[in-house]
């Protein structure tokens, strides 16, 4: 079991403070949900954790060992699923898989995963939103990172793929720790062990839709 | 960072923009100038072109363990290694 601790994250854009002493901690086997209105700093937090966006201050520890933000990518400790696809759009799926996994055994794990045969002859740019997100998650799932940050994995997916992605996320818990943000709050609450909402640059723990209403992420309670 | 096939994909995509600009420069200013641009100013064009058309793909390389600065430095060093000697020969003998 591995533990990721991210603490004292501060980030400002000009005079506007986006993150104020935000701390998140989780371990492999856990799924953490992160909510927040648009512009609340969810993606900013994830990018600061990955090291692609410089935070004003940030401490990252994995199993107690402090890691500089610049070391996160080279050491492959944290993987990231961005909102936009990270795969080359002009390539066929069957060529992308060997590009990422040179070993045949690793490739087979992807090729023989549920549903991949249906689109492995397609060009990445021609995949549906659901197929694309599912493929990206499968690829990330087989990479060595113990922790994954997922920026809106359910966004724009048809219900069939939302279910497939949820199944995949739950199966990933056995080997990885996941932090995911999404506005599909019911799906996130369903798979997450714990959740937080970002409000006025700070993170608050939430357990239910009612808490999301309390923190004014939701306007009305739809229960 | 052992995935060399992924790196070469980045190398080709990055240099596509660099090469297009350098080849155009070569047409107007000569081969030597084109090569010189390829290993210098063309790197900036490659960077801008990649950022404009393929920015999201950087996350593929981040996930594979390549930082942006590592990728760009390695592309530049390889361009110097490949094109530097050619440029030197052109300057010395032509």
Roles of regions detected by a PLM:
Chain A
Residues 4-6, 19-21:
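Conserved structural motif at the start of ABC-family nucleotide-binding domains
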């Amino acid at each position: 079991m591995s533990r990721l601790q991210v603490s004292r994250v501060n980030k400002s854009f000009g005079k506007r403070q986006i993150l104020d002493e935000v701390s998140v901690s989780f371990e492999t086997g856990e799924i953490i949900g992160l909510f927040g209105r648009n512009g609340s700093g969810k993606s900013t937090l994830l990018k600061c954790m990955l090291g692609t966006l410089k935070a004003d201050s940030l401490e990252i520890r994995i199993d107690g060992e402090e890691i500089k933000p610049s070391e996160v990518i080279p050491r492959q400790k944290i993987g990231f699923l961005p909102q936009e696809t990270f795969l080359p759009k002009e390539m066929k799926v069957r060529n992308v898989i060997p590009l990422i996994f040179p070993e045949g055994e690793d490739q087979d794990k992807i090729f023989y995963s549920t549903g991949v045969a249906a689109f492995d002859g397609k060009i990445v740019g021609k995949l549906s939103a659901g197929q694309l997100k599912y493929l990206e998650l499968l690829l990330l799932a087989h990479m060595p990172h113990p922790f994954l940050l997922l920026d809106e994995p359910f966004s724009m997916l048809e219900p069939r793929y939302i279910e497939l992605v949820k199944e995949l996320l739950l199966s990933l818990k056995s080997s990885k720790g996941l932090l995911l943000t999404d506005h599909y709050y019911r799906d996130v609450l369903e798979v997450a062990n714990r959740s937080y909402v970002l409000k006025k640059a700070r993170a608050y723990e939430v357990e239910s839709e009612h808490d999301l209403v309390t923190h004014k992420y939701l306007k009305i309670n739809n229960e | 960072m052992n995935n060399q096939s992924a790196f070469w994909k980045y190398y080709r995509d990055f240099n596509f923009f660099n090469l297009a600009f350098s080849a155009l420069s070569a047409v107007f200013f000569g081969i030597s100038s084109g090569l010189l641009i390829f290993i210098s100013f063309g790197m900036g064009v490659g960077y801008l072109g990649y950022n404009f058309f393929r920015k999201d793909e950087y996350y593929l390389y981040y996930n594979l363990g390549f930082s942006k600065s590592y990728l760009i430095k390695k592309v530049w060093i390889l361009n110097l290694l490949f094109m530097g000697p050619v440029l030197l020969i052109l300057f010395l003998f032509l």
